[in-house]
């Protein structure tokens, strides 16, 4: 912890991407920038170079209380704001984000390490689209009327929960914040949001850009360690819901916290997603086969730091040798390096600690008897990038009972094995504690459909992978989570239903 601003900091503009940052960022509470109550800040390093990016508020319980005070002060006013006005504000937020797309994308790259080509073409545009989508959904949402009898009617109303807590992961900081904020705000809730300690920057810049569009207190952002303020927020009796994206282990704790106050939770947790390639993908040397090869290589998307990372590849035995020759060649052609270079396809891991975790898992795989087919080493770059957190995309061959097949690594490490029949592929796919995502690749529509229905996962991509449209439901089976994010059904996760049962009859029941 430090109390003084840094005397010098890295200048992102040196790489040709202008990004003017403040030396220090506070919390956003009640529509204002508020210094942490204890006056402490932590150093936020960029994974691009391993150097200081900025300092960020290191908050405590008093800061969460201030945010909750601000949210409760305005919650009734925001809840009674018309859906037309709430939707209009969400559209304005999306427009402001679009006007500042390059700024947000560049900040996300510096803070997280992912390539600028991803943040500018995927992360930020998707975040923008989610605000527009839920602005549209809330305008289209209707209540319901049930006629009990000719003189009795049940009216059903959607009402906001009140003040909700949201805890954001470090792998998609801005997108995950948008996934949670957009439906919560559309439904009429106020938000206390905690960004990940490793990647707070893009959300803070977002509030600089759009904070004036919202009534003070509707959105509050408090920075700091999850073990301190995340736990305090999740256990607070002053929130009506908690939404969390992160590891299964922490998700279990969040769920226990929520039970203390009997509040609903949305949990999007870990995964070990199978990506299944049937023999017919090689029937033709065509665009579909090329697409399948790209689908295989997508384990390296976002440096493998994705809950739905296709980190297990199941390849039909009859094509294994031929398929893997082409697949390895495709993976080895991935351009990794400086995330701020627009041709870079794979950037830096988010932190030195995460880099070490991934390398440790590669060692575990070797000790278990897995063969390293490519990669497996830290990638050393030159110049100002020499202290960045870079890794070679890695493919291991082994058996599904190995730890590298069963445990979430959260890095660009793919565990590959083979299967003979559809039944064996299905058994291997479901042999995991997780059930967040899966991929199926086949030219046979009937086969792909049967596999998709049989796989125990909340989303099964068929002849595609890593698409996250706003109007497609996302969430996990088994230990991958509870509830769904995205899609209009998400509105109901931030609402409660009131039934107003009205009798228009003058006649008594006649019971007493």
Swiss-Prot record:
EC number from the UniProt entry: 1.2.1.4
Catalytic activity: an aldehyde + NADP(+) + H2O = a carboxylate + NADPH + 2 H(+); acetaldehyde + NADP(+) + H2O = acetate + NADPH + 2 H(+); chloroacetaldehyde + NADP(+) + H2O = chloroacetate + NADPH + 2 H(+); propanal + NADP(+) + H2O = propanoate + NADPH + 2 H(+)
Stated induction or repression of this protein's expression: Is repressed by Fis. Positively regulated by RpoS and Crp. Induced by ethanol. Expression is maximally induced during the transition from exponential phase to stationary phase.
Active site: 268, 307
Purpose: Catalyzes the NADP(+)-dependent oxidation of diverse aldehydes to their corresponding carboxylic acids, with a preference for acetaldehyde and chloroacetaldehyde. May play a role in detoxifying aldehydes present during stationary phase. Cannot use NAD(+) instead of NADP(+) as the electron acceptor. To a lesser extent is also able to oxidize propionaldehyde (propanal), benzaldehyde, mafosfamide, and 4-hydroperoxycyclophosphamide. Does not use either glyceraldehyde or glycolaldehyde as substrates.
PANTHER family: ALDEHYDE DEHYDROGENASE B-RELATED
Family membership: Belongs to the aldehyde dehydrogenase family.
The protein's name in its UniProt record: Aldehyde dehydrogenase B
